[in-house]
Amino acid sequence: MNRFFVTEKNNDSFVLSKETLKHLQVIRIDTKPFICVYNEKFYECVLDNNAAKIIKKIEQNHEHKYEVVLAMAVIKLDRFEWALQKATELGVTKIIPLKTQYTNHDLLKFNKFSSKYERFKTILQNAAEQSFRNKIPVLTELMTLKQVLNLSIQNKYIAHEKIDISSNLPQPIDSDVIFLVGPEGGFSDEEINLAAKNNVKVVSLGSRILRAETAAIFMLSQMKID
């Protein structure tokens, strides 16, 4: 069943955006039921006078018990967008674009990155709808490593290719968690030392060198969080 996030309820119906109505027309929904997600709850609906008339509420929760945050260094836009999509499918609740020492700073000039935020949010919403999420991940503004290290979540893991391979990701995760992934070239030794001094767990992702977006998805997929 097709799924759409909605933000406005009117009695026994949901108000549909122009984009959603257009999508429903394209897929020729007609009288077939579809799912609206409102305030993290699922509702089976049918199209009625360009609104989504509620048939019944569906009691399902597809979210992790804990907050799962991905702090990922800014990389080439197409790869960053791919990571946004896959991270959403894997259940992250928040994504923090990260500015690091080895970040390609050309990507941050002339609003190349910040001007894409609406597009990024659309990618997150589409991925959340596709993967039957109860909510869309939050995309924050750009942060530095120091800012992320100062966040209140205590359970943090940072990927580093130079650490011993035996330093694997522990299982399972039983509290809110932040995963930190660097850009192409990884984190600098200075950044790793700073993270370690702030009680961040430095972990290996194996003997092979992974692309930044692959490393992010590998970390998320390896963790048993539910």
Predicted regions and their residues:
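N-terminal positively charged helical leader segments and presequences
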Residues: 1-60
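Glycine/charged-rich beta-loop-alpha catalytic/anionic-binding loops adjacent to active sites
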Residues: 15, 65-69, 175-178, 197-205
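Short glycine/proline-centered loop/turn elements that form peptide/ligand docking sites
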Residues: 18, 97-101, 188-189
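Non-catalytic positions within long, well-ordered alpha-helices that form the structural scaffold/packing
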Residues: 25, 88-91, 196
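RNA substrate-binding interface of SAM-dependent RNA methyltransferases
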Residues: 61-157
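Active-site/ligand-binding-proximal alpha/beta "capping" segment
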Residues: 157-186, 190-191, 201-203
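Structured adenosyl-cofactor binding patch, chiefly the S-adenosyl-L-methionine
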Residues: 189-226
